[in-house]
From Swiss-Prot:
The protein's name in its UniProt record: Glutamine synthetase
Name of a matching Pfam family: Gln-synt_C
GS catalytic domain: residues covered: 103-467
Binding site for Mg(2+) 2: 130, 211, 219
BP terms from Gene Ontology: glutamine biosynthetic process; nitrogen fixation; nitrogen utilization
Organism per entry: Azotobacter vinelandii
Length: 467
């Protein structure tokens, strides 16, 4: 009996929630009665209209198949009726193969490509998505004007505000949230509830804490996993965090830079490659790294700007990637140096040796970001791209003449998309990313970039209204 059918029977499940992720990284779903699930369901899947998903099919060829991945079946802890969540792959009906533009299919192809190279058989990923918990957010963007307003009782700007029950103080200042105990940490209980929900859904929580920024910046660390499974788990984490916050009457955002003047939210990504059960990144070189790991780093540095198109895919991403807010803008590597975009964390055992890319952020589609990072690293290994000397000094304090010698991440989404367009060759190896998908992705993200660039900004009224 399949895992899904067993859970349906054991928990008297009434509904099946089929999940998939669109190009922009947002999880989508459709729900069907559990009584319709049988063995044929896992062979033939469920038809749906793909024309309504941005960046996918036109209306003239819209039929697509949601093919359930039985291994992902898990009970939904947030529904009143017993509901089973199953993550799906998108299948092209004419070929019964994975749809070329399905992010999960791309991630699967990246895993298969790794095996085909002989470099390794398993890629491990450990992302750390940060997020803000707010009490309320209001925003508007239309022809009459635009605005946003954040309401957060624990925000540094509310030291003199009036609240029902009084203002008790005890709030983290700007860049002061890492990491005092309660009552300064207002979010301990809600984070614990989020962790309980994550554990219910099969994720292994390792740590949770308040992050650096005021107004409720937080992080929940969960254990690493293989590429596709970890991308699935990122989507599960976002689902849990959003829904627990909603149950508490709060609201969460994973956008990279919701606050001006304080730290943004990153998604540092830890990575390693194993072959025959051995960590290929462990060696006798710098910081205990092997040549394989150094070449992997070289590939990420070489393709860093093109990677930004997937790892930092929003206009808001580049408001985080600026000096002065603990966001790494220099494409350099170092042991334990958090100002470098690639860090080699200290570990107790060679089995845990890994690298950490610090420039990605949680607006990224995890399937695309992880696949792209792997492809960049593999290109570095295949071409023996050495990253040069490590940068063991504080890169934030470099004099201008030294800083200009170190490559930097992109400064805007427009630049990132241009770099992705011209530097795509490493991504299309082995048919992992197709030119068709990259073209469609560039078109989709360019629409966002143009809209933001041409929209009238409230700050422009401050600067120019009285000219």
């Amino acid at each position: 009996m399949s895992k899904s059918l067993q859970l349906i029977k054991e928990h008297d499940v009434k509904w099946i929630d089929l999940r998939f992720t669109d190009t922009k990284g947002k999880q989508q779903h459709v729900t069907m009665p559990a009584r319709d699930v049988d063995d044929d369901f896992f062979e033939y899947g469920k038809m749906f209209d793909g024309s309504s998903i941005a960046g996918w099919k036109g209306i003239e060829a819209s039929d697509m198949i949601l093919m359930p991945d039985d291994s992902t079946a898990v009970l939904d802890p947030f529904t009143e009726e017993p509901t089973l969540i199953i993550v799906c792959d998108i299948i092209e009906p004419s070929t019964m193969q994975g749809y070329d533009r399905d992010p999960r299919a791309i991630a699967r192809r990246a895993e298969e490509y790794l095996k085909s190279t002989g470099i390794g058989d398993t890629a491990f990923f450990g992302p750390e998505p940060e997020f803000f918990i707010f009490d309320e957010v209001k925003y508007k963007s239309d022809i009459s004007g635009s605005m946003f307003k954040i309401f957060s009782e624990q925000a540094a700007w509310n030291t003199d505000a009036d609240f029902e029950g009084g203002n008790k103080g005890h709030r983290p200042g700007v860049k002061g949230g890492y990491f005092p105990v309660p009552p300064v940490d207002h979010d301990h209980e809600i984070r614990t509830a989020m962790c309980n929900a994550l554990e219910e859904m099969g994720l292994k929580v390792e740590v949770h804490h308040h992050e650096v920024a005021t107004a409720g910046q937080n992080e929940i660390g969960v254990s690493f996993n293989t590429l596709v499974a970890k991308a699935d788990e990122v989507q599960t984490l976002k689902y849990c965090v959003h829904n627990v916050a909603d149950a508490y009457g709060k609201t969460v955002t994973f956008m990279p830079k919701p606050l001006y003047g304080d730290n943004g939210s990153g998604m540092h990504v830890h990575m390693s490659i194993a072959k025959d059960g051995k960590n290929t990144f462990a060696g006798e070189g710098y910081a205990g790294l092997s040549d394989t790991a150094l070449y992997f780093i070289g590939g990420i540095i070489k393709h860093g700007k093109a990677l930004n198109g997937f790892t930092n895919p929003s206009t808001n991403s580049y408001k985080r990637l600026v000096p002065g807010f603990e966001a790494p803008v220099m494409l350099a590597y170092s042991a334990r140096n958090r100002s470098a975009s690639i860090r080699i964390p200290y570990v107790n055992s060679p089995k845990a040796r890994r690298i950490e890319a610090r420039f990605p952020d949680p607006s990224a589609n995890p399937y695309l970001a992880f696949a792209a990072l792997l492809m960049a690293g593999l290109d570095g290994i295949q071409n023996k791209i050495h990253p040069g000397d490590a940068a063991d000094k504080n890169l934030y304090d470099l004099p201008p003449e030294e800083a200009k010698e170190i490559p930097q991440v992109c400064g805007s989404l427009k630049e990132a998309l241009e770099e992705l367009d011209k530097g795509r060759a490493f991504l299309t190896k082995g048919g992992v990313f197709s030119d068709d998908f990259i073209d469609a992705y560039l078109e989709l993200k360019s629409e966002e970039e143009i809209k933001v660039r041409t929209f009238v900004h409230p700050l422009e009224y401050d600067l120019y209204y009285s000219v």
